[in-house]
């Protein structure tokens, strides 16, 4: 997943933030339709598992009956999604993490009890899917207690929000300048790095990005 907390930058906490002076971007796809498809594909007699890879680890915002470290194969965490409200602006877009095809990703899976699953998923949708930019997928997540199928918010390389490859100069410029209503892209990167480290998760790409920020005097 991941927005910083949402697809192209809206959040369930929008009412707590200043009202923007311009209208938010139009949805890429119909979020309501995607939600109904996801609900229809979930066995409502079972608990709901959700995979978090960035802000859902350090700010899940839903009651989890259980959480486990987990690894997904076939997708990796990448700082390659534009953020034009939360961590940047339309004039100076920031970046947030997304789950992109290829490689693997270690994160956290959360179990939401079935009695609360639909209500919590609807809340989560308002946070992550207001513009329908993510591709919600059920992914096999491997944990020490066994595999679980969890909902993950992935990003297609064909998405208009996918940045593609960014060279170091472009990344440094974004880390130096991009700031949105929830703070800067740099703060988001550093917070994610600290959270993953505290969870015992190593991400070499993030470590490299943090080191790059330090070399340019952007982080201590």
Per-segment meaning from a language model:
Residues 1-220:
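A glycine-rich, hydrophobic/aromatic-adjacent loop/helix-cap motif
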């Amino acid at each position: 997943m991941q927005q910083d907390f949402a697809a192209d930058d809206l959040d369930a906490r929008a009412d707590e933030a200043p009202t923007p002076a311009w209208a938010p971007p139009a949805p890429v796809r119909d979020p309501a339709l995607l939600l109904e498809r996801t609900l229809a594909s979930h066995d409502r007699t079972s608990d709901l598992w959700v995979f978090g890879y960035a802000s859902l680890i350090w700010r899940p915002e839903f009651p989890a009956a259980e959480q486990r470290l987990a690894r997904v194969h076939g997708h990796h965490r990448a700082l390659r999604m534009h953020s034009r409200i939360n961590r940047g602006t339309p004039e100076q877009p920031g970046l947030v993490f997304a789950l992109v095809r290829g490689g693997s990703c270690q994160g956290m899976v959360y179990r939401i009890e079935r009695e609360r699953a639909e209500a919590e998923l609807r809340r989560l949708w308002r946070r992550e899917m207001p513009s329908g930019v993510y591709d919600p997928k059920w992914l096999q997540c491997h944990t020490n207690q066994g595999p679980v199928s969890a909902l993950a918010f992935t990003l297609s390389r064909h998405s208009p929000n996918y940045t593609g490859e960014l060279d170091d100069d472009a990344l440094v410029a974004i880390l130096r300048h991009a700031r949105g209503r929830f703070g800067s892209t740099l703060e988001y990167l550093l917070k994610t790095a600290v959270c993953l480290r505290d969870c015992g998760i190593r991400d070499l790409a993030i470590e490299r990005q943090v080191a790059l920020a330090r070399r340019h005097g952007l982080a201590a």
